A protein has these predicted regions:
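Bacterial Sec-dependent N-terminal signal peptides
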Residues: 2-5, 11-43
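First exposed extracellular module after export/assembly in secreted or surface-exposed proteins
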Residues: 28-226
Length: 226
């Protein structure tokens, strides 16, 4: 019996250790010098900096006018900055669009500014009504890119997904001057489009969803007609 208990405790200890290494937020992690340099160069006025690791990334939580989090790869390449901003800090075009939308009467919660490598800046307004919570994604010019049910997932869901050159070439040729706003890979194994890459673009002022299959070939493009 003692041997069984010891084995169980050892297994639990190993599991806890692995989890701690994957998501270390105790503020005592060692940050490589090149990463420190990259952060200081990009955010020279950052204050109250605290480092942690999430999903294999180094994440700096800091204050630079507003509370923000910056995500970097281990070799110091910046991936994303998520800034918590007040409503009045939104571009006027975003506020005008929101205030004329069906969600204008909903209660506003968090508002985030997302800056990511490879895609344009996006503003996310989280609204709620009774038991419903929805995230509204806007471009800086006030275009509503998409609205999705808030799942309270980790912020890593906003990390950019790299498009293949073939995907980029297809978008450039099929939709000239399109602005790439969001890139997601469907990760629900129960959905028919598991593993597909969804690219949200704005083409000629119209938000469109471009879908590529698991082999990277174009599958479909859809948009709303009003």
């Amino acid at each position: 019996m003692k041997l069984k208990i010891y084995t169980l405790l050892l297994a639990l200890s190993v599991t806890w250790s692995l989890q701690s290494c994957d998501n270390d937020d105790d503020g005592s992690i060692a940050v490589p010098a090149e990463l420190q340099s990259a952060f200081s160069s990009k955010f020279p006025n950052a204050a109250n900096v605290k480092w942690e690791t999430k999903s294999g990334y180094y994440v700096a939580d800091f204050y630079d006018g507003y509370e923000a989090s910056a995500w970097f790869t281990q070799d110091g390449k910046w991936q994303m900055t998520e800034t918590d901003i007040p409503y009045n800090a939104l571009p006027q075009a975003v506020k005008t669009s929101f205030e004329s939308s069906e969600y204008a009467s909903w209660k506003r919660d968090d508002i985030d500014k997302l800056e990511r490598t490879g895609v344009e800046t996006v503003f996310v307004i989280e609204v709620e009504k009774q038991n419903q919570e929805v995230d509204l994604y806007y471009s800086a010019d006030g275009t509503l890119i998409k609205s999705i049910v808030d799942t309270d997932d980790d912020n890593s869901e906003h990390l950019p997904v790299q498009l293949t050159e073939a995907m980029k070439n297809f978008i450039n040729e099929k939709y000239p001057n399109a602005r790439i706003m969001e890139v997601d890979v469907e990760d629900d194994r129960n959905d028919w489009d598991f593993g597909y890459t969804e690219v949200d673009i704005i083409h000629n002022g119209i938000p469109k969803d471009v879908l590529f299959n698991q082999t990277g070939n174009w599958y479909s493009t859809s948009w709303e007609i009003r």
